[in-house]
C-alpha cells in the first residue's frame, strides 16, 4: 500500500490480516530493515510451520528497507510463495528495487476530499458525544489535511470536558 503519511496504509494492512484466517508477522521496517532482520525474523517466520492456511508478513514502511535486504526479501517472496504473502506499506514506492516492486500489486491510498474527511470527523465526534462548532472542525481539517491521523489526534488534543475547544491553534 502506498500513500501519504496518515492515509491508513498500516491500518488497512492490519484490518486485512485480522479478517483472514492466518498467522502474521508485523515488522516496522523503519527500525528493522537490515539483512539480519530479513533473514532471521522474516525468513524464520516464512519457513516455519502453521496450522492456518496462510501466513502474512506485514512490512510497514518497507521503503526504508536497505537495498541488500530487499534482494533477500525478493528471494523469500519467491521461495515461500505457496504459503506466505507479503504486505508492504510505504510513502515512497519508487525506493523499492524494480524486481521487488514488479512482484507486488500496488494500491495507492489517495486521500478523500476535505469535505469527506470533515464529514467523517463529524460522525466520529457525534458518536463520541463531543460538542463542536463547524468552523473549528473546518480549521482542524484545513490545517492537517491530508493526514487523517493528525486530524484525529488534534481533535483528541483539543477536546476538553466533552467539547472541542481550539483556543490558539
Q: How should each PLM-predicted stretch be described?
A:
Residues 147:
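Short, conserved phosphate/pyrophosphate- and ester-handling motifs at nucleotide-, phospho-/glycolipid
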Amino acid at each position: 500500500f502506498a500513500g501519504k503519511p496518515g492515509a491508513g496504509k498500516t491500518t488497512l494492512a492490519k484490518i486485512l490480516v485480522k479478517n483472514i484466517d492466518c498467522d502474521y508477522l508485523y515488522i516496522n521496517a523503519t527500525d528493522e530493515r537490515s539483512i539480519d532482520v530479513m533473514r532471521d525474523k522474516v525468513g524464520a517466520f516464512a519457513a516455519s510451520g502453521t496450522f492456518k492456511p496462510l501466513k502474512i508478513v506485514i512490512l510497514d514502511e518497507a521503503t526504508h528497507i536497505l537495498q541488500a535486504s530487499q534482494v533477500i526479501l525478493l528471494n523469500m517472496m519467491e521461495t515461500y510463495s505457496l504459503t506466505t504473502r507479503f504486505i508492504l506499506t510505504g510513502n515512497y514506492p519508487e525506493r523499492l528495487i524494480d524486481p521487488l516492486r514488479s512482484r507486488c500489486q500496488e494500491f495507492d491510498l489517495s486521500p478523500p476530499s476535505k469535505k469527506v474527511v470533515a464529514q467523517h470527523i463529524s460522525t466520529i465526534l457525534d458518536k463520541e458525544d463531543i460538542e463542536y462548532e463547524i468552523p473549528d472542525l473546518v480549521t482542524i481539517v484545513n490545517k492537517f489535511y491530508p493526514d487523517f491521523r493528525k486530524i484525529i489526534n488534534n481533535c483528541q488534543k483539543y477536546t476538553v470536558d466533552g467539547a472541542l475547544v481550539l483556543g490558539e491553534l
